Design a protein with these regions (language model features):
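NAD(P)-dependent short-chain dehydrogenase/reductase
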Residues: 127-199
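N-terminal Rossmann-like NAD(P)+-binding domain of SDR-like oxidoreductases, especially those catalyzing
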Residues: 1-149
Length: 199
């Protein structure tokens, strides 16, 4: 999460000053300075644009950001001898699966959005890089809208803008940011959960 409030929340929770560098991962030279300045063993790569709908409206921005930043990570890891990467992929790599629920053995289908395409391409780049470069180790995690918050509520799911999926609407309503949560449709299995703001 690139929100400075999240960085401050981590500092409060840990009671430590946490190094934070704001850099465009697509800017190779600027990103390179991070690798020069800091010692670390592993990279967890979350830096990506992630709104499926927006990716349909702005496909070139998504391809540029998500692919360039990931390739820069791999290039810099090789240059500086960093060997371990965890890649934040997405369940969108499954496309329109033939069978639900999907498992890790479910074959990938064509993605249904530019965002999904970028995640498939990054997985391919990771696979090919692991095969080509000795010592490089990595894994891709295929998330399904991860949610949650620290018990202190200093960090977690409470977006400030317009949410892109249901859970942020629920948390905003529970936190009193939204007055109510409207649920539309009539094909729910016999129950409806009302979410009311505190008080």
């Amino acid at each position: 999460n690139s929100d400075m409030g999240a960085v401050e929340g981590v500092r409060k929770i840990t009671g430590r000053e946490v190094p934070f560098v704001q850099v465009d991962c697509c800017d190779y030279e600027a990103f390179r300075k991070v690798f020069e300045e800091y010692e670390f063993d592993s990279v967890i790569h979350f830096a990506a644009s992630k709104a499926v709908g927006e990716s349909v409206q702005k496909p070139l921005e998504y391809y540029r950001n998500n692919l360039t930043s990931f390739m820069n990570v791999i290039r810099l890891m090789r240059e500086f001898g960093r060997h371990n990467i965890v890649f934040s992929s997405s369940c969108t790599v499954y496309g329109e699966a033939d069978k639900l629920p999907v498992t890790e053995q479910t074959p990938r289908k064509p993605a249904t959005s530019p965002y999904g395409n970028t995640k498939q391409m990054c997985e391919d780049i990771l696979r090919d890089s692991l095969a080509a470069y000795d010592g490089l180790r990595g894994i891709a995690l295929r998330y399904f809208n991860p949610i949650g918050a620290h018990p202190s509520a200093l960090i977690g799911e409470l977006p400030r803008g317009v949410p892109q999926n249901l859970v942020p609407y629920i948390t905003q309503t529970a936190a009193g940011v939204r007055e109510c949560l409207s649920v539309f449709g009539d094909d729910y299995p016999g129950f409806l959960i009302a979410i009311l703001p505190p008080g």
